[in-house]
């Protein structure tokens, strides 16, 4: 089970691959954090934003989780509009709906 709530059928290969990578990480927590964001935003990202998202997908899961939870500072190379959008997408006081 991928967890995704959208169909990849209408997506171009680049976006389909990114959707798969977002939902199939090494850590279930990152599957949820990246996958939910991809479900909500992947279809509308510009080509430049896709470059940024693919860079995020290439990062190590433990590092991503540390940055997103504030346990470690976000490196400049990842401090991009898409990363800030991803972090804002999950910035709330209640539990994450899975």
Language-model regions: role of each:
Residues 2-98:
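Positively charged, polar, low-complexity stretches
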């Amino acid at each position: 089970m991928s967890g995704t709530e959208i169909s990849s059928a209408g997506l171009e290969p680049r976006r389909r691959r990114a959707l798969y990578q977002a939902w199939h990480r090494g850590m279930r927590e990152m599957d949820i954090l990246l996958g939910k964001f991809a479900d909500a935003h992947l279809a509308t990202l510009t080509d430049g934003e896709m470059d940024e998202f693919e860079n995020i997908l290439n990062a190590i899961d433990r590092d991503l989780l540390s940055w997103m939870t504030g346990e470690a500072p976000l490196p400049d190379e990842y401090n991009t509009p898409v990363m800030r959008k991803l972090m804002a997408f999950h910035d709330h006081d209640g539990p994450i709906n899975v």
